[in-house]
Amino acid sequence: MVASQKFSDAEIDSFGEALNDTKKPLKARFRALFILRNIGCDRSVDWIGKCLNDESALLKHELAYCLGQMQNKHAIPTLVSVLEDEKQEPMVRHEAGEALGAIADPSVKDVLRKYAQDPCPEVSETCQIALGRVEWVEKSGKDTNSPYDSVDPTPSASTSDVEELAATLIDASLPLFDRYRAMFSLRNIKTDKSIKALAQGLYCEDSALFRHEVAYVLGQLQSPVATQELKDRLLLSTENCMVRHECAEALGAIANEECTEILKQYVNDEERVVRESCEVALDMAEYENSDDLQYAHV
């Protein structure tokens, strides 16, 4: 793990400068970001925060995601500022709200309550779920760390009955918090049956936020069982770009020949965030098929 190593300020600054260098390919900037995330110190947080005025919504959303995964309270003012900035793209504001939920400091509850009423559904739904997570962590004294080295937006459900979880997942009458809990349980079960059930969430038309989270979780699983469903939503030009981009990255994580060929077809998509996602996903697929032990080299 990178975080176990000691880095000088100068070394951290070199990664930060690489992240903020707009002349570098996006895939190189992503690798610099992941190194800073794994280091996790305040200086890393500051470098990541400095990049949140970039032109790439994809990069900015990943910056906010990483700040949440680091769970460093030093990032809270930066994330609140991004959430409040209506000029930021919805996918970036959403990720800032989710990151505040991941850090789960009680001080963010008021701002999450405020933006749980935001007119943008991706933002309001995110803040409702994030507030639920902060309150759950407060009440239970536990975190929502997953077997996938990530901080989940909600805990997993208490049942392991795949059919029951599948029904909860696609029930639009239930709160998103409960459906997310079913989602993470299906992921953790990790059978072909649970993955197929999970993939059906990509067809739930009631929430783009929900579909994008399903795609993200399928990327964590890296199972070719879900390839067709991910392909369906990437190919759908009317789909929300948040969902299409997450489908692209999930296909990159699966990294087989079929997925790589799909990504190559969309590397020139009209939507910038989809184009860039395919570029990064192809880089990730190349890594998955290489002998490299670590994606973000130091």
Curated annotation (Swiss-Prot):
Its cofactor is Fe(2+). Residues 143-159 have a biased composition (Polar residues). Pathway: Protein modification; eIF5A hypusination. Keywords: Hypusine biosynthesis, Iron, Metal-binding, Monooxygenase, Oxidoreductase, Repeat. GO terms for molecular function: deoxyhypusine monooxygenase activity; iron ion binding. HEAT-like PBS-type repeats lie at residues 28-54, 59-85, 92-118, 178-204, 210-236, 243-269. Its EC number is 1.14.99.29. The keyword Ligase does not apply. It comes from the Eukaryota. GO terms for biological process: peptidyl-lysine modification to peptidyl-hypusine. Disruption phenotype: Embryonic lethal with the production of multinucleated cells from the one-cell stage of embryogenesis leading to the in utero accumulation of abnormal and enlarged embryos. The keyword Magnesium does not apply. It is an enzyme of class 1 (oxidoreductase). Catalyzes the hydroxylation of the N(6)-(4-aminobutyl)-L-lysine intermediate produced by deoxyhypusine synthase/DHPS on a critical lysine of the eukaryotic translation initiation factor 5A/eIF-5A. This is the second step of the post-translational modification of that lysine into an unusual amino acid residue named hypusine. Hypusination is unique to mature eIF-5A factor and is essential for its function. This is Deoxyhypusine hydroxylase. It comes from Caenorhabditis elegans.
